[in-house]
């Protein structure tokens, strides 16, 4: 499904105007593949490029070299229209959902906007199903992100991604800001969701001990 070949990211920086620019690599020649319904864990120290790699995989940033192939398409050679169509298949859940969600909109509108952006019809029944699955109270739909707890905001972020029925969900330090109880609950939800749906996860984390329910391959940056 996904194949990453010799992927590199660097920035060219000049320390002084009279010096030649020098390449500073975030990562270099990364290779891995991921089959449908399998998982991958990406580990590495802070600043190793984990989030940069995630952003490249979902078109938010371009690589400096190498290729990303998804279901036979070289992603960064596609035009913007085709990339946009694929965004519903490759979803990215940011680390801090309270910061990622638009603070001026109600949760109901944030979820419905996501559906409309990809030409899905508004579906209150489907939203209710996801709220039941993630054990969220329906009154949250009328609240705004700043009114939610960290665990509630993370669940809402996951619903916004999963309601599009993606094939691949990239989870960037999804439980790093949560307590152990909320972390285990959310990972348990994700585990059971995968048992019922044909989805692959890429976990970016430094807390691998919490992911004991999942089978996954691992790479380290």
What are these model-derived regions, one by one?
Residues 58:
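Helix-to-loop junction immediately C-terminal to a conserved catalytic motif
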Residues 157-158:
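Hydrophobic anchor residue at the start of the ABC signature
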Residues 165:
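Conserved catalytic motifs of ABC-family nucleotide-binding domains
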């Amino acid at each position: 499904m996904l194949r990453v070949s010799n992927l590199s990211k660097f920035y060219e920086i000049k320390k002084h105007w009279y010096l030649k620019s020098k390449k500073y690599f975030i990562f270099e020649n990364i290779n891995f593949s991921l089959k449908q319904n399998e998982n991958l864990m990406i580990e590495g120290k802070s600043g190793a490029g984990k989030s940069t790699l995630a952003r490249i995989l979902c078109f938010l940033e371009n690589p400096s070299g190498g290729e990303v192939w998804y279901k036979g398409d070289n992603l960064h050679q596609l035009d913007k229209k085709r990339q946009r169509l694929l965004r519903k298949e490759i979803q990215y859940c940011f680390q801090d959902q309270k910061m990622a969600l638009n603070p001026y909109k109600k949760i109901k509108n944030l979820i419905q906007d996501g559906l409309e952006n990809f030409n899905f019809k508004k579906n209150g029944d489907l939203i209710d199903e996801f709220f039941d699955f993630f054990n969220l109270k329906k009154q949250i739909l009328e609240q705004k992100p700043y009114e939610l707890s960290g665990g509630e905001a993370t669940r809402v972020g996951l619903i916004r991604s999963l309601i599009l029925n993606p094939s691949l969900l990239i989870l960037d330090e999804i439980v790093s800001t949560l307590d152990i109880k909320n972390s285990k609950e959310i990972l348990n939800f994700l585990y059971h969701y995968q048992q019922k749906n044909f989805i692959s996860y890429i976990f970016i984390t430094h807390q691998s001990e919490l992911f004991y329910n999942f089978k996954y391959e691992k790479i380290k940056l």
